[in-house]
């Protein structure tokens, strides 16, 4: 939609664009409650949160909302993993890039333990509380998921040093039922199941979009 059409209909932006500003997103009470549990519980205690649902139900929108809101909180550093299918070494490299610390394994056996120690030292020095967002988490290798569990178990001065929010489809739920990932499942503190919107919710969303897009 070009500027002339936007002006003709009195709109600040196209309300049907996939690239909506955050204030235009329609947030249901269930999503608000999920965010409240993240802010008041997860980032205080650490561990995992889980968002599941079929493609197109809004999982990525929820992650976008969380990234913006959590990023405004004091002492919180938010990072989004963009390569969920990476191996363990590449996962650590991406974590290092996200949180400004060098995390490159130097040997196969003791390397990842050394990286956990370096990660801990970095957080002790910065006093930041990191939150990691991972979309399409069903693509993650079990070894990487287990490494995340180990990182969320690290503590310093009674502070849990990592919170992780996973989002994925039914394959993620099935993967977390594997025996080697059961310890991770026990650390999921809050869950949100996304569903396709019904008629009333769609109408409420449409009204919200038009109201926020209007001049």
Segments and roles (model prediction):
Residues 121-127, 131, 156, 165, ...:
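Helix-loop-helix "sensor" segment of P-loop NTPases
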Residues 44-65:
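Walker A/P-loop nucleotide-binding motif
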Residues 6, 87-91, 102-147, 156-159, ...:
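Mid-core helix/loop region of P-loop NTP-binding domains shared across ATPases and GTPases
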Residues 72-83:
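Conserved catalytic segments around the Walker B and adjacent sensor/switch elements
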Residues 48-52, 79-80, 133:
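Short hydrophobic/aromatic beta-strand immediately N-terminal to the Walker A/P-loop
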Residues 40-44, 69-74, 121-127, 138-143, ...:
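Conserved catalytic network of the ASCE P-loop NTPase/AAA+ motor domain
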Residues 11-18, 86-105:
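Conserved NTP-binding/hydrolysis module of P-loop NTPases
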Residues 1-45:
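A short, basic N-terminal segment
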């Amino acid at each position: 939609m070009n500027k002339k059409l936007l002006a003709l209909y009195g709109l600040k932006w196209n309300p049907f664009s996939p690239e909506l500003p955050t204030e235009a997103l329609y947030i249901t009470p269930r999503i608000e409650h999920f965010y409240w549990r993240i802010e008041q519980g997860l980032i205080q205690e650490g561990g995992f949160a889980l968002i599941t649902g079929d493609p197109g139900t809004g999982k990525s929108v929820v992650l976008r909302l969380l990234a913006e809101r959590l990023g405004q909180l004091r002492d919180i550093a938010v990072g989004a993993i963009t390569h969920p299918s990476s191996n363990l070494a590449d996962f650590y490299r991406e974590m290092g890039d996200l949180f400004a610390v060098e995390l490159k394994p130097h040997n196969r056996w003791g390397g990842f333990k050394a990286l956990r120690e370096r990660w801990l030292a970095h957080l002790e020095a910065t006093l930041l509380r990191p939150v990691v967002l991972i979309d399409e988490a069903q693509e993650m290798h079990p070894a990487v998921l287990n490494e995340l569990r180990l990182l969320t178990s690290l503590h310093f001065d009674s502070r849990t040093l990592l919170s992780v929010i996973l989002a994925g489809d039914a394959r993620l739920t099935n993967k977390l039922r594997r025996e080697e990932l059961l310890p991770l499942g026990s650390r999921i503190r809050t869950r949100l199941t996304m569903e396709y919107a019904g008629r009333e919710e769609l109408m409420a969303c449409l009204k919200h979009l038009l109201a926020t897009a209007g001049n």
